Amino acid sequence: MTMQFLIASNVLLWLALIGCAVLMLGLLRQVGLLHERSSPMGAMITDHGPDVGDAAPTFDLPDHSGAMVRIGGPSALKRPTLLMFTAPTCPVCDKLFPLIKSIARAEKFSVVMISDGQPDEHQRFLAKHELGDIRYVVSAEVGMAFQVGKIPYGVLLDPEGVIRAKGLTNTREHLESLLEADKSGFASIQQFMTSRKHSHDAKAA
């Protein structure tokens, strides 16, 4: 009887331990999802790489059709350029693609998508999406030069090739914040709020 009780108690303890392990894994997954969703404020967060106000690194690279693309430097079309760092297997990038096209048309920007990955992955992406005037470049070197750590990531260049805004662009709001950061003249929301505070204090005085 005592032996049966010990066996039963050990079984229950093991079941409880397994249950705790499953619960812990579930909690860790939820924490990861929460971190993923709460991270980006888009272009209103500054990070590593060339700073806003710096001249962008320049590259001459072939696009998906073999035509050469100049990244950085003065724009031949005399208009801003939006560099979008993506990957063909990135689901967020895939969902964001129609928004990139619509914002590019509305704002009259040139758009260069800079991607990395396997050739067959790029072929599937290009077969699925109509690029229009968007140039598609495969290059890990460009991402390294801008020190892009997460995607989708946007960098806005003015017509002279100077970086005016940059940041993660997980949603339409993030893309819009990229444009607002450029229009407001601030690299981050922190700078914008500090400027507003100083302006308010000056008026109060």
Curated annotation (Swiss-Prot):
Gene3D superfamilies documented for this protein: Glutaredoxin (3.40.30.10)
Molecular function, one GO term: antioxidant activity
Positions of the Thioredoxin domain: 50-184
Single GO BP term: methylamine metabolic process
Membrane-spanning ranges: 5-25
SUPFAM superfamilies per the UniProt record, alphabetical: Thioredoxin-like
Xref: Pfam families: AhpC-TSA (PF00578)
GO CC field: membrane
Subcellular location: Membrane
Name of the featured protein: Methylamine utilization protein MauD
Gene that this polypeptide is encoded by: mauD
